[in-house]
Amino acid sequence: MKKRNINIKSRLEIQELFKKGQFVKIEGINIFYRFTSLAISRILITFPRVFKGAVKRNRVRRVFKECFREYFTLLKDGCADFIFVVYPQKANINYHEVKTILKNMIVYVIKRKV
């Protein structure tokens, strides 16, 4: 798998992650994750239907992906797939907020694995 391809695209993988993955809720964001045997961690950012405005959705998506690229190397022992469900109250989230959320989330996931 190429390093730049960090997206989860398969419908079956997405459904399985929603059903069998671990769940964490942070204010305005639901996070599903599951450890995999792949060589790289992957991510999917999705939104409920009430989240209007493609420009805002795409901006949130770009910010999450960039922060994830920066921090997924912390998961060096085991790779995981993540789904972030972002709600409208987090529409104006900035890069630094996402950075702290992802850093705390990855530390939490590493502790849960051990």
UniProtKB/Swiss-Prot annotation:
Keywords: Endonuclease, Hydrolase, Nuclease, RNA-binding, tRNA processing. It catalyses: Endonucleolytic cleavage of RNA, removing 5'-extranucleotides from tRNA precursor. Gene3D superfamilies: 3.30.230.10. GO terms for cellular component: ribonuclease P complex. Its EC number is 3.1.26.5. It comes from the Bacteria. GO terms for molecular function: 3'-tRNA processing endoribonuclease activity; ribonuclease P activity; tRNA binding. One of its GO terms (biological process) is tRNA 5'-leader removal. It is an enzyme of class 3 (hydrolase). RNaseP catalyzes the removal of the 5'-leader sequence from pre-tRNA to produce the mature 5'-terminus. It can also cleave other RNA substrates such as 4.5S RNA. The protein component plays an auxiliary but essential role in vivo by binding to the 5'-leader sequence and broadening the substrate specificity of the ribozyme. Belongs to the RnpA family. Consists of a catalytic RNA component (M1 or rnpB) and a protein subunit. This is Ribonuclease P protein component.
